[in-house]
Design a protein with these regions (language model features):
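Active-site- and interface-proximal helix/loop "cap" or "latch" segments in soluble metabolic
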Residues: 2-3, 50-196
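N-terminal intrinsically disordered, cationic/polar leader segments
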Residues: 17-44, 49-58, 70-72
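Compositionally biased, low-complexity repeat tracts
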Residues: 8-9, 42, 181-182
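Charged, compositionally biased non-catalytic regions
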Residues: 1-13
Length: 196
């Protein structure tokens, strides 16, 4: 399918029931990759892409080839060990309207925010409505969740001698009742809370 090279592998691995006869009309992918830096910060690179597998005419962009990106937003968050965003880089390689990229400087308003309770509300206070971009907000929500995994993964990843020891930056108690596996009294929480 045209444009699929921009997305993660979409062909294999599906365990869903066989679908009814259908044809693809849009693919949205949100991909995050996390990296541990030598200075102890964690970088989360995020990419949001929408493509259509057919050629179409846009009232604002003219002819759009099959597989071309309607939306393509990229962000990098640099987060310290206390979960504070230290830096943000942004790019908008493809937008549906010429003026979309005018809000790019506004994304710097997330620098200094802490990823944790209240993060989504703080994002919307700074970047909601005409101050931001719906798609960038969606990407930031996913990147915040990716940051949680990045900090957890950093506890298991091999370290070079120059890198600091990982610290647990998430209180296990904050996970209680956030999903079925973390339910109060469940086996997973009992085992996690019993660890020193």
């Amino acid at each position: 399918m045209a444009g699929e090279a921009q997305h993660a592998d979409l062909a294999g691995g599906w365990l869903l029931p066989e679908p009814a006869p259908r044809e693809a009309i849009c693919t949205r992918s949100i991909v995050c990759r996390s990296f541990r830096r030598n200075d102890g910060l964690i970088d989360i690179d995020g990419r949001f892409i929408d493509t259509r597998p057919f050629e179409y005419d846009s009232d604002f962009r003219g002819p759009c080839p099959a597989g071309s990106a309607l939306h393509h937003m990229q962000l990098r968050l640099s987060v310290d060990r206390s979960r504070h965003i230290q830096a943000l880089a942004s790019a908008m390689p493809a937008t549906p309207y010429e003026g979309c990229a005018e809000v790019n400087p506004n994304f710097q308003r997330v620098v200094g925010l802490s990823i944790g309770r209240g993060f989504r509300k703080a994002l919307r206070e700074r970047l909601g409505g005409v101050e931001g971009c719906t798609h960038v907000l969606a990407l930031l929500d996913v990147m915040a969740a990716a940051a949680v995994q990045a900090f957890a993964s950093s506890n298991y990843a091999p370290r070079r001698p120059s890198q600091p020891e990982p610290v647990r930056v998430w209180k296990l108690e904050a996970l209680v009742d956030t999903c079925h596996s973390y339910r109060t009294g469940g086996e997973v929480m009992q085992r996690l809370l019993a660890k020193p």
